[in-house]
């Protein structure tokens, strides 16, 4: 069974509810690796167990007719698309699982397009043929309508719903009827001849010589048909379609047969792009002779075991006791045991070569997207592109004892998911987590609680507002304090002027004649900077102000650094109040990608959020890109609304553009809310 040619890996992709997890569980049960065909063996994450759904990818290895097979079950929810992206990235084959009742759904289309972008060949498995209203012909017609690749049904159902009893392999001309674990093989009924003739034409047209023989009336043999089917599949030109039922275990053996017979092996697969230490781009091919290299595509934090790392071996061979380097972190790791995954169990192996998936325990580092490599060739595999996390919430530990634990827990969780990030904002004093949607953050926060024991309160993150002035004003303040010994004396006159947006702060010294000694000028500057930390309207930092120090006075004995700082602080506050202050808000440059039919609704939604649409342009595959500028305060729940408008097909990116003045009616609300906040803090 050794050798690259005998390894197969496939990612199971599709919409939530298409039956991917049950399909994997049934395959493992039929292979004798688990006791029962139950998704509880697949969804073993503590949050998944509680909610009964898949929120992460699950990996299993098995042996099938002389092949080492690795299957990656990916989640069907769009919020967990990073798991799908990585699953596709490390698989040489893709199995798109389609619900025979619902047909092509949103995630069917989105994940298919991802496989297209990564140039991965696709097999379709039409699942749930035993369900009421299952319709194989409708699904095939929909696949042909939606996707550009040639759709070729090769394993078709016998009956449907309660009459579903088996499948026909049109190429082998064999029918398979299932009765529990028993399978009866028989010749293909004549009623399937027309269907077979139709798909033969689709296959033989891939090979000109074969097509001529077929047109001359020659009966093309099974081996030649499979050879041409494999060539078309490998090139991404043909999509073989199979059918069955994961629940009843029908057609799964044929699915594995086709994966073994036409599936792409590591030996036939394209190379991975990588970077050398000096930034030179190279390609790393699947090879036992090359120095070791593996890509980390999954990282799990287990409350008992610790860090569990899943890696795809691309080059070289990994053995227990080997020393490897985490290239991104520049950390040397000593590999203890080497395992292959069987869901939450692991099987220890003596070695793992190219194309195989390994599980490593208790590595010091190992975030998703990082590379483990031989110390003499520290290559970094270029990871796939992940969507930017745009849905944010603030989190606060419910217990003071959890303050130290929250950073550690969030860091470990972000290691496991490149679309989950967190940061502490010193300006607002908040810890802010960001992900791809409300469900995404809910699951990550639940994991924080169940795995790390940190319970948090969740809220909308505070907006980093600013305050500024809109006109020129002059102010002065004389700070005078007499005590028993030395007193305090500082006197400043300043002029405040608005600066162009984004200029920050400028201090101008126009003192002449020594009315304020040179050694106290920095004290005035320091006092003004301190005053600018809290504006007079709502206590937000002040920006875009020029302060000119033009006059003042001092006392030979009582003047000091602190005296001039206090005088400057008070003078600045007076000046700002007189200079017609306003609140500024961050404006984001937003790009929204939506289906063409939803563009109008999305433009309207943007306008209702005080946004300015800037234009629209095609972005391919029936999608358009809407460009706009929108206040950040209006984008906090946009992700959920966009998902609702586009049925989960839309997504967006945004980046900070500039600050702008808040409209007066909005400013009043911000000031009132800020006052309530400060009153709460004082209690």
UniProtKB/Swiss-Prot annotation:
Protein name, UniProt field: Elongation factor G-like protein
Q: Which UniProt keywords apply?
A: GTP-binding, Nucleotide-binding
Check the record and name the SMART domains matching this protein.
EFG_C, EFG_IV
An example of a GO molecular function for this protein is: GTPase activity
What residues does the tr-type G domain cover?
5-267
The answer to keyword GTP-binding applying to this record is yes
Q: Could you state one GO biological process linked to this protein? A: ribosome disassembly
